[in-house]
């Protein structure tokens, strides 16, 4: 079974308790790009609970919630018994698709011989690195630490 809703990262404890030996593929994208995305559904739905006052600067709030949620998910997945964890950065999937897919297939226990075929179907978004072209986003210490934790410069 696979669940691909971004909000599921907030429910690691539930999934770990419900599915012993769960395999968690943590797919994430650079939070700075996410901050400039038009997809603010999660922020609109849960922003008041997670980041009160988010309407003052939605882009900063998007980044903070990205940092909080992804750090929490990674920590929970690593600390909960029985959870296998695999980090897959969207940027790596797009820049090195065969390598990223081979590692993913190995993690889930699928034959890795199909990696090249799957890699040919990867279609990178034009929004990768878009944050570099935008007005600089003020980053909190938490956001900087999360970017570093996940290998973003």
Regions found by a protein language model. Name each.
Residues 33, 92-96:
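Acidic, metal-coordinating catalytic cores used for nucleic-acid/nucleotide bond scission
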Residues 11, 15, 97-100:
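Residues at alpha-helix caps and immediate loop-helix transition turns in enzyme cores, especially N-
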């Amino acid at each position: 079974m696979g669940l691909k809703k971004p909000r599921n990262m907030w429910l690691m404890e539930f999934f770990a308790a419900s599915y012993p030996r769960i395999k968690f593929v943590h797919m994430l994208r650079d939070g700075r790009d996410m901050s400039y995305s038009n997809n603010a559904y999660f922020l609109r739905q849960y922003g008041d609970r997670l980041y009160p006052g988010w309407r003052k600067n939605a882009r900063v709030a998007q980044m903070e919630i990205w940092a909080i949620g992804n750090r929490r998910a990674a920590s929970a997945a690593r600390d909960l018994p029985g959870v296998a964890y695999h980090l897959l950065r969207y940027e790596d999937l797009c820049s090195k698709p065969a390598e990223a897919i081979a590692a993913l297939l190995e993690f889930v226990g699928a034959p890795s011989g199909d990696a090249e075929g799957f890699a040919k179907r990867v279609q990178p978004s034009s929004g990768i690195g878009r944050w570099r072209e935008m007005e600089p986003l003020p980053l909190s210490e938490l956001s900087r630490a999360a970017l570093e934790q996940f290998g973003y410069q």
